[in-house]
């Protein structure tokens, strides 16, 4: 097919259908479908795999979706090209015109993570979300860690990104560098519909399907984290959530320079590198520090470290505080109170990963 053939067969594919004068864009449809599937898969992991309540996450959805859209839009105005629409529209009209694209994933993730760090520690303190675990012949009531929810929810963000990238295709945006027909012969054979629409009229050239490459790689990242990660024996609570930041940061760091020049933003590349570095540092800390101290309450830690000055007072104090919520904690402290080894509580999150 020659370039002239491309020109004569090209058509606007951004609109899925119309309701009266309202055009429903494919971009919005793919973003919505991505959100819905991500929510479903997160709930499946929580309810069926970890055996814990999905309700805290369910209610967070009503906070997380608008927050993520807001963060993605703000970030697109800061580091992307969404601000160009201000030349023809007022700020509010341009900012809330999601149908035309302009959502930067990093901004959505960052703002949603901040919201989650505030929301989940508060909500999970409610007794109705505690989990009863049987160890031997005894039952213990445990407060579910925020990290358990993070492991179930965060990797599912990749699902939204896998599907959402197809919105870029229908909008004919965020494409790769100029390509020859020979380079995309495989695409013409396997996905002729995509191939025929990779001739971008604004540049007058055939381009690599950047959206397809990133979507495909994210798909395998998702399978590796969501399913494969559950079979890693020595992992800690939080590792799967952290793996998302590492994988996505590395992918974007490698893929960003591959974008067509009009869609390359230096700030986006820097943020992608920071995402990956943040994930790597967090993973190291999670294994060396967080997993060992995560379950300590501050006062328990201080009391244990000063036990040699008033052992009996500590024992009486801990006995008086024993209840269903911290029974295992007290037994561990009482067991170790006359010993001097480094006293670390076994992370309670392991119960949920073992199917209790």
Curated annotation (Swiss-Prot):
EC class: transferase
Ranges annotated as spanning the membrane: 24-44, 59-79, 103-123, 144-164, 209-229, 265-285
Function per UniProt: Catalyzes the transfer of the diacylglyceryl group from phosphatidylglycerol to the sulfhydryl group of the N-terminal cysteine of a prolipoprotein, the first step in the formation of mature lipoproteins.
Lineage: Bacteria, Bacillati, Mycoplasmatota, Mycoplasmoidales, Mycoplasmoidaceae
Enzyme nomenclature, EC number: 2.5.1.145
Gene behind this protein: lgt
PROSITE patterns: LGT
InterPro entries recorded: Lgt
Name of this chain's protein: Phosphatidylglycerol--prolipoprotein diacylglyceryl transferase
Similarity field: Belongs to the Lgt family.
Pathway(s) this gene product operates in, as recorded in its UniProt entry: Protein modification; lipoprotein biosynthesis (diacylglyceryl transfer)
Membrane topology: Multi-pass membrane protein
Provenance organism: Malacoplasma penetrans (strain HF-2)
GO cellular component terms, semicolon-separated: plasma membrane
Biological process according to GO: lipoprotein biosynthetic process
Alphabetical keyword list: Cell membrane, Membrane, Transferase, Transmembrane, Transmembrane helix
Compartmental location: Cell membrane
GO molecular function, one term: phosphatidylglycerol-prolipoprotein diacylglyceryl transferase activity
Binding locations of a 1,2-diacyl-sn-glycero-3-phospho-(1'-sn-glycerol): 165
């Amino acid at each position: 097919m020659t370039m002239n053939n491309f020109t004569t067969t090209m058509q606007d594919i951004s609109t899925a259908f119309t309701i009266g004068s309202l055009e429903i864009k494919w971009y919005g449809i793919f973003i919505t479908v991505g959100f819905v599937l991500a929510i479903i898969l997160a709930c499946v992991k929580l309810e069926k795999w970890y055996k814990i309540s999905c309700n805290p996450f369910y209610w967070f959805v009503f906070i997380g979706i608008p927050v993520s859209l807001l963060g993605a839009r703000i970030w697109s105005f800061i580091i992307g090209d969404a601000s160009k629409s201000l030349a023809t529209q007022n700020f509010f009209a341009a900012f809330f015109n999601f149908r035309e694209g302009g959502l930067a994933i990093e901004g959505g993730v960052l703002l949603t993570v901040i919201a989650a760090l505030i929301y989940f520690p508060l909500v999970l303190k409610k007794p109705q979300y505690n989990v009863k675990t049987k160890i031997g012949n005894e039952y213990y009531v445990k407060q579910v860690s925020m990290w358990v929810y993070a492991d179930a929810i965060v990797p599912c963000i990749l699902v939204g990104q896998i599907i959402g990238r197809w919105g870029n295709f229908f909008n004919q945006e965020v494409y790769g560098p100029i390509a020859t027909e020979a380079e995309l012969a495989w695409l013409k054979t396997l996905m002729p519909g995509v191939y025929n629409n990779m001739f971008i009229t604004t540049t007058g050239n055939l381009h690599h399907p950047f959206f397809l490459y990133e979507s495909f790689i994210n798909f395998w990242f998702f399978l590796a984290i969501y399913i494969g990660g559950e079979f890693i024996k020595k992992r800690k609570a939080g590792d799967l959530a952290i793996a998302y930041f590492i994988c996505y940061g590395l992918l974007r760091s490698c893929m960003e320079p591959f974008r067509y020049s009009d869609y390359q933003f230096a700030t986006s590349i820097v943020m992608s590198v920071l995402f990956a570095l943040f994930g790597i540092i967090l993973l190291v800390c999670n294994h060396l520090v967080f997993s060992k101290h995560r379950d300590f309450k501050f006062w328990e830690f201080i009391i244990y470290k000063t036990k040699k000055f008033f052992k009996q007072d500590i024992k009486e104090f801990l006995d008086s505080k024993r209840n269903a919520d911290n029974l295992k904690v007290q037994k561990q402290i009482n067991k170790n109170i006359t010993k001097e080894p480094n006293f670390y509580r076994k992370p309670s999150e392991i119960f949920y990963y073992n199917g209790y």
